[in-house]
Structure formats: structure tokens, C-alpha cells
């Protein structure tokens, strides 16, 4: 019989940081899990906008953003790994060269062609751009979950793309029927 850890797959789930999260990097975050397997896990923080918008970022990478309503869209802190690199989470299209398909209809793309398409008015209809990602080695995430570091729930793309970033934490908890004020940082306490 397989161990319980062998059966867990958090791909297309939200990780919701518990109040007692020991790592301040992830305090108050919601992480969308793009990949989780026996080698480890990769996700993107979806509720931590940084002080840069798409127009500014596109200028830095020599792209002219033709769609003005997108110019003020926030760029997000995706996690502490490779923070100089962009990761685009978007509705699945199958059109870009370096994309990871995620069950549930989303893709994570790391190639510049998706940004070029967005700059020219094409590209995915719904997307968020993060700098960096959250990564865990084999067994690390499972250990954090067992120590009450994270709650998990099936992801809802509407929260990623249509809920304001400051409301995504509460919206993700609401998927579990939890009011954020009712959480305790200690296991076994309400």
C-alpha cells in the first residue's frame, strides 16, 4: 500500500498560509500550485502585488504595450525563487513556447512570446504576471502542511483573475467556509 504522502497532488490547488506561518516570506499569502510531483512543487503567489506595473516592466524589457488599459495592471511577487524572471499565469491557449499546462484550464508560461503577444493586443485574455516563484524540494511542502503551515483547497480561477488582490486571501479561505478572523496560529485551537 502506498504511503499517504505518495497520494497527495496539490497541482491546481491554492495553498493558503496559516497565521502561524514561520516563514514571513509567505505570511498572508495565497499560492496557486502549478506543479506538484515526487520531485517537489512549484507555485505562484497570487495576492502580493509589487510596486511595478505592466507598462514599466514592459519598458524595461524593450516591449511597447499597445493596450493602454493593461498599462496599470500590477505585477506580482510570485515567490522567492528567480525573482528576476517573469512567470505568466493565464487561461490555457497552447500557443506559447515555454508553457506548463495545469489541469483545470490554466497554463504557466515563462517565454517572452506571451509578453510580446500581450504587448501587441493579443495573448491570453486573462493573465497575471509574477516575478519569481515559490518552490519546494521533494517532501518539503508536505512537511510544512503537516506542521499546520498551509491550508489547501481546489483553486478557482475567478479568484486569481477577477478578485482584487487584497481580497484573494479571504476569498480563498471562503472556499473552505472559513472566516479569516476565526483562524488560529496553533494546531488544535480555534
Curated annotation (Swiss-Prot):
GO cellular component, one term: cytosol
UniProt organism field: Ralstonia pickettii (strain 12J)
Signal peptide region: none
Pfam family, one: DUF179
NCBIfam families reported for this sequence: PRK00228.1-1, PRK00228.1-2
Family per similarity comment: Belongs to the UPF0301 (AlgH) family.
Name of the molecule in the record: UPF0301 protein Rpic_0619
InterPro entries, alphabetized: AlgH-like (IPR003774)
Amino acid at each position: 500500500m502506498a504511503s499517504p504522502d505518495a497520494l497527495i497532488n496539490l497541482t491546481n490547488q491554492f495553498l493558503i498560509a496559516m497565521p502561524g506561518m514561520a516563514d514571513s516570506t509567505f505570511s498572508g499569502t495565497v499560492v496557486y500550485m502549478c506543479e506538484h510531483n515526487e520531485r517537489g512543487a512549484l507555485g505562484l503567489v497570487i495576492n502580493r502585488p509589487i510596486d511595478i506595473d505592466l507598462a514599466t516592466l514592459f519598458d524595461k524589457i524593450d516591449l511597447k504595450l499597445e493596450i493602454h488599459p493593461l498599462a496599470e495592471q500590477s505585477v506580482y511577487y510570485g515567490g522567492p525563487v528567480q525573482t528576476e524572471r517573469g512567470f505568466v499565469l493565464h487561461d490555457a491557449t497552447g500557443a506559447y513556447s515555454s508553457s506548463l499546462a495545469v489541469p483545470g484550464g490554466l497554463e504557466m508560461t515563462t517565454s517572452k512570446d506571451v509578453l510580446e503577444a500581450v504587448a501587441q493586443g493579443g495573448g491570453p485574455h486573462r493573465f497575471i504576471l509574477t516575478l519569481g516563484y515559490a518552490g519546494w524540494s521533494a517532501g518539503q511542502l508536505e512537511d510544512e502542511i503537516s506542521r499546520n503551515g498551509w491550508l489547501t483547497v481546489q483553486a478557482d480561477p475567478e479568484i486569481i483573475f477577477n478578485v482584487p488582490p487584497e481580497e484573494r486571501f479571504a476569498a480563498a479561505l471562503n472556499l473552505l467556509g472559513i472566516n479569516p478572523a476565526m483562524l488560529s496560529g496553533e494546531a488544535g485551537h480555534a
